[in-house]
């Protein structure tokens, strides 16, 4: 997996796109810069056991690179500011499970949606008081979520800012629920299933769907690469490859936890660090 741009390779947003023998765009081996947080299960993370970058984003975009003759160059970026960085042209594309919204579409372009999702309420497995969003509205509860996300926006709009505790990373929000520092979280169902797989004895999803949205890849406005990725997504849907990758990462069988990923940072609250971290 490439981690940084070389000084000689041609950027994919500057190449002449031809058609390959498979009928898909051929990008001639160019480098395609891709922003990843590397801290958002199951989309992208660094496996602490072997130091290898893994996740849905990696599997999908690596396969696209094989289909359309480009080299993904994954560049770590903080979620807070990622969308603006894409809008400013710092990256050719961003993953990280970005929800397609009209507000975001004003400053960036989106690919076709690759997953339909719903927002759900997540609570500790032993919690019997909270069974729906109505319980959160009517009770004295604290809801943890990640700042800058549609989950945060929904929580504030439905519950009021005083009830919402915002974290820089979603894993902190989930750990707050597990530890009892927060009563619930508002989370995308796909990510929630991943957390349930990783913490089957600690968290659960309750209530029905709160919203219906789609996730898409984010690009600078006017990027010629949007159509390239859309064709790649369509090909992966037709071949069954996308469904195969979705089943791998978006189900309770996904068992990677935040204790299994390399994310030791002195800025992370000590109670949320993996046990073997020394910072």
What is each stretch, according to the model?
Residues 9-22, 150-165, 205, 234-279:
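Ligand-binding clefts/hinges and TM-proximal coupling segments of bilobed small-molecule sensing domains
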Residues 12-97:
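Extracytoplasmic small-molecule ligand-binding "clamshell" domains
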Residues 30-36, 133-148:
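Short loop->beta-strand "edge-of-pocket" segments that line small-molecule binding or catalytic clefts
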Residues 58, 71-135:
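Acidic, polar ligand-binding/catalytic clefts
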């Amino acid at each position: 997996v490439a981690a940084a741009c070389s000084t000689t390779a041609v950027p994919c947003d500057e190449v002449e796109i031809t058609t390959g023998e498979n009928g898909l765009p051929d990008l001639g081996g160019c480098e395609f810069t891709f922003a990843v947080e590397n801290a958002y299960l199951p989309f992208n993370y660094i496996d602490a056991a072997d130091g290898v970058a893994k996740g849905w984003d990696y599997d999908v975009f690596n396969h696209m690179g094989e289909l359309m003759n480009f080299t993904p160059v994954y560049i770590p970026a903080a979620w807070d500011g990622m969308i603006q960085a894409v809008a400013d042209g710092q990256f050719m594309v961003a993953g990280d499970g970005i929800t397609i919204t009209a507000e975001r579409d004003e400053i960036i372009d989106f690919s076709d949606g690759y997953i339909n999702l719903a927002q759900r309420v997540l609570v500790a497995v032993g919690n019997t008081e909270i069974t729906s969003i109505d319980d959160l509205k009517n009770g004295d509860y604290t809801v943890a979520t990640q700042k800058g996300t549609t989950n945060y926006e929904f929580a504030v709009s439905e519950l009021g800012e005083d009830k919402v505790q915002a974290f820089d990373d979603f894993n902190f929000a989930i750990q707050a629920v597990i530890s009892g520092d927060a009563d619930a979280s508002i989370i995308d169902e796909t990510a929630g299933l991943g957390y349930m797989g990783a913490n089957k004895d600690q968290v659960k999803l309750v209530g029905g769907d709160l919203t219906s949205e789609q996730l898409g890849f984010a690009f600078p406005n006017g990027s010629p690469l949007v159509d390239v990725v859309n064709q790649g997504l369509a090909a992966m849907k037709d071949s069954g490859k996308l469904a195969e990758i979705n089943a791998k990462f978006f189900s309770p069988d996904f068992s990677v936890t935040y204790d299994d990923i390399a994310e030791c940072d002195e800025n992370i609250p000590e109670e949320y660090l993996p046990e073997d971290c020394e910072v």
